Amino acid sequence: MNDNLVCLGIITSPHGIKGAVKVKTFTEKPENISLYGKLISGDENYKIDSVSVIGDNLVIATISGVNSRNEAELLRNKKLYIERSKLPELNDEDEFYQSDLVDMEVRLKSNELYGYVKSVYNFGSGDILEILVISTKKRIMLSFTKEIFPHINIKGRYIVLNIPEFID
């Protein structure tokens, strides 16, 4: 993926017969996904005309040029990106975009390299980081909380892991 793109959401399914879609958003407020103009997915651009919030991080959206359920079905699972330069500047060192975490080093408190962040998920109850553990070549998923990840160094491209007791 292009480092200059940030994922704002994913189209999960069609909604109704007139071309509306359900979109899982990764924006601070779900309705904000319509504020950024054209969104990018592969070689295509999409403009969200309207949104209705139906839940935490879930909206029903209408997209320019999509007028039927069949057209909406073709958009299922498409990720919607925006150029990073179009996003607001982050002023606080504790602020970052989720995409900034991907490929970051995961270090233990001793500064020993433990693995790498491979993905950020949210299945509804909070953010989860998928970590590729170097020593085992296995992937684990951990809740992205301050207790488990007490320090994030965006400029240094690493995150500190306070390893939970249940992981050996």
UniProtKB/Swiss-Prot annotation:
Subcellular location: Cytoplasm
GO cellular component, one term: cytoplasm
Keyword Cytoplasm carried by entry: yes
Coiled-coil region: none
Single GO MF annotation: ribosome binding
Gene3D superfamilies the UniProt entry points to: PRC-barrel domain, RimM
GO biological process: ribosomal small subunit biogenesis; rRNA processing
Key words, A-Z: Chaperone, Cytoplasm, Ribosome biogenesis, rRNA processing
Family named by the database record: Belongs to the RimM family.
Biological role: An accessory protein needed during the final step in the assembly of 30S ribosomal subunit, possibly for assembly of the head region. Essential for efficient processing of 16S rRNA. May be needed both before and after RbfA during the maturation of 16S rRNA. It has affinity for free ribosomal 30S subunits but not for 70S ribosomes.
Domain notes: The PRC barrel domain binds ribosomal protein uS19.
Subunit structure: Binds ribosomal protein uS19.
Protein name as catalogued: Ribosome maturation factor RimM
